[in-house]
Amino acid sequence: MPTGLGYDFLRPVEDSGINDLKHYYFMADLADGQPLGRANLYSVCFDLATTDRKLTPAWRTTIKRWFPGFMTFRFLECGLLTMVSNPLALRSDTDLERVLPVLAGQMDQLAHDDGSDFLMIRDVDPEHYQRYLDILRPLGFRPALGFSRVDTTISWSSVEEALGCLSHKRRLPLKTSLEFRERFGIEVEELDEYAEHAPVLARLWRNVKTEAKDYQREDLNPEFFAACSRHLHGRSRLWLFRYQGTPIAFFLNVWGADENYILLEWGIDRDFEHYRKANLYRAALMLSLKDAISRDKRRMEMGITNYFTKLRIPGARVIPTIYFLRHSTDPVHTATLARMMMHNIQRPTLPDDMSEEFCRWEERIRLDQDGLPEHDIFRKIDRQHKYTGLKLGGVYGFYPRFTGPQRSTVKAAELGEIVLLGTNSYLGLATHPEVVEASAEATRRYGTGCSGSPLLNGTLDLHVSLEQELACFLGKPAAVLCSTGYQSNLAAISALCESGDMIIQDALNHRSLFDAARLSGADFTLYRHNDMDHLARVLRRTEGRRRIIVVDAVFSMEGTVADLATIAELADRHGCRVYVDESHALGVLGPDGRGASAALGVLARMDVVMGTFSKSFASVGGFIAGDRPVVDYIRHNGSGHVFSASLPPAAAAATHAALRVSRREPDRRARVLAAAEYMATGLARQGYQAEYHGTAIVPVILGNPTVAHAGYLRLMRSGVYVNPVAPPAVPEERSGFRTSYLADHRQSDLDRALHVFAGLAEDLTPQGAAL
């Protein structure tokens, strides 16, 4: 049975013990003993985190130190390690449907016995892909594009003839690369026996591995090179490059009885003075092509990576290879890994003629990964892999369970008392006795809910008095309540705006404001965050439209304050309305805590003011305030208000009480801002990118979503709770922690948190991550 190199190639791999591979051999025979097929299997631990190009080696090391098992799994793989042929050698191609299911069953049993997490049948070529898919998909496998290889079909009798197929521009660099002797004084030896050089080869190869950023490579040792020389004598050749007698690079190639010539490994001394100019990799490719031609080989397989240089070789083409994957027990992990590999494995930059074909294959594999048909609306659920990837990696930390009230500290299930740096209860009123008692009394008096829309049977005198108090608090004629802050934005904006209108938004507005704009059917456009020059250009460009500027007063992820004074001026100048979301400013900023608009002296110029009760006002719900006709219009046309049950009595009463306490105890505003500034200053001194903008929110920027999630878990297990932030909440480069503070934070708890942060500074700060 043809097997590319032949299975004896694997003897050097076994003898050298590289990567602690455990080897198995599969044979499928007929009843009379005639072989049908055979395959090489091996079990190996693989670090999938090395395929994440956005996760630097320093970050990866940090996460591994915290969570040693992060993205490291044992794979039971079927393949020849060289990617030169399909993983299963068959007596006849027609035997595939008989043998492959048996192989998959044997792998399943081996994985169970071996403790492997994943099964992988790798390096299936495009020609056989559909048949493998038809057999393996019903068995729970999913396909993924693997590392693409570069091949060239040899149809020339000499290197000179091959070069003659190229343009002068492409031919010249290849031709001159062979002049390394004349130009740099480099000598090359062609060796069939090279065991004595094994230590040098391992050292030069390690330079390549150290610089590689594409995936976890095999860990070749001197024993491997010595075993290759011993077992592959007459079927391998080493080119050893020397400069002034010292080995500086090598290329090791192998071949079998078939038509394939394989470029196996290479290594180089990057400190060699002519390293860049000599381009010995290009020279070695040309020497390899010459050798392959002399041996009458019809195909030179150049492996993966270094695509740019390899594609300069005459006739070189990128060949997609497909992996079939399956988790040993969990179909969700199967789908997640397949999606992650498609997302993480680097694709080569290709010429247009190759790129089009490659893209077609990529889209085909993505479609074949789907567990649901194209017409099924739930297919998007099957396609996502962000949060399932966190679960697979063991760093999923959403929905932590707390077992007590949120004060300076909070009780977390299985973790005990931890410092809370991730609450929106800025004034600390959610546990204030007066607020708690008001909530309890309202429940006793009115019951737990109103069981109806505010428009009909859901309005209590408690709701009416709260609306009046809020309107008075903000100096607006009227206010209307909604059941949540999110609903408040949806109700107001979708009622006020319609098709043909223009909504102008800050690029970093809260998600609810964008959802509201989409729900309204209006057009909307963005201006760069707090960039008033850009806003002015947008207003000039949209002159003549019915427009409204929609903006957060304090931005929930950044803690920055909108330039509301300039916004008010621009709105007046261009005849535009302004809608401001004061959710994170009310209670904290401005006279009596009336928000950023009041602090900047422009509250009266804000056409519509929205606020929420789930932050400073210790409850749940939201409201919209403005001129009475505007508010009345929202009352009757805001779907989030009309078609939702009204605010529970307990929530309305708690908000009433919180408003009273916040005005009676103004020092709470000073305390929360002092706590935020203290922590921002302390974190910055430790080297963190911690930003203070005069609000209760202090973002800590890390720059990588995975690090943000892992760091969040590490902090929580060290006794400090922060909120992890990552896309889509923030741009990827702003991933990190959102810390926020409350007036009741004890100094001892803040110092305890700083102590924990200090212990992680070497891992999490830019200076530490670079080490």
Curated annotation (Swiss-Prot):
Q: Where is this region: KAPA synthase?
A: 419-771
Q: N6-(pyridoxal phosphate)lysine: which positions carry it? A: K615
One Pfam family matching this protein: Acetyltransf_6
Q: Name one GO molecular function term.
A: pyridoxal phosphate binding
Gene Ontology CC terms, in alphabetical order = peptidoglycan-based cell wall
Q: What class of enzyme is it?
A: transferase
Q: Which residues form a coiled coil?
A: none
Q: Which reaction does it catalyse?
A: 6-carboxyhexanoyl-[ACP] + L-alanine + H(+) = (8S)-8-amino-7-oxononanoate + holo-[ACP] + CO2
Q: Which residues cross the membrane?
A: none
**PROSITE patterns, A to Z:** AA_TRANSFER_CLASS_2
The record ties this protein, via InterPro entries, to: Acyl_CoA_acyltransferase (IPR016181), Aminotrans_II_pyridoxalP_BS (IPR001917), Aminotransferase_I/II_large (IPR004839), AON_synthase_class-II (IPR050087), BioF2-like_GNAT_dom (IPR038740), PyrdxlP-dep_Trfase (IPR015424), PyrdxlP-dep_Trfase_major (IPR015421), PyrdxlP-dep_Trfase_small (IPR015422)
Example GO BP: biosynthetic process
| Region of interest called Unknown, as start-end residue ranges on this chain | 1-418
Q: Where does pyridoxal 5'-phosphate bind?
A: G485, Y486, S556, D581, E582, S583, H584
The record ties this protein, via SUPFAM superfamilies, to: Acyl-CoA N-acyltransferases (Nat) (SSF55729), PLP-dependent transferases (SSF53383)
EC number(s) per entry: 2.3.1.47
Keywords, alphabetical: Acyltransferase, Pyridoxal phosphate, Transferase
Residue numbers binding substrate:
R407, H510
| Cofactor requirement | pyridoxal 5'-phosphate
Q: What does this protein do?
A: Catalyzes the decarboxylative condensation of pimeloyl-[acyl-carrier protein] and L-alanine to produce 8-amino-7-oxononanoate (AON), [acyl-carrier protein], and carbon dioxide.
Q: Which family does it belong to?
A: In the C-terminal section; belongs to the class-II pyridoxal-phosphate-dependent aminotransferase family. BioF subfamily.
Q: What is this protein called?
A: Putative 8-amino-7-oxononanoate synthase 2
Q: Which organism is it from?
A: Mycobacterium tuberculosis (strain ATCC 25618 / H37Rv)
| Encoding gene (name) | bioF2
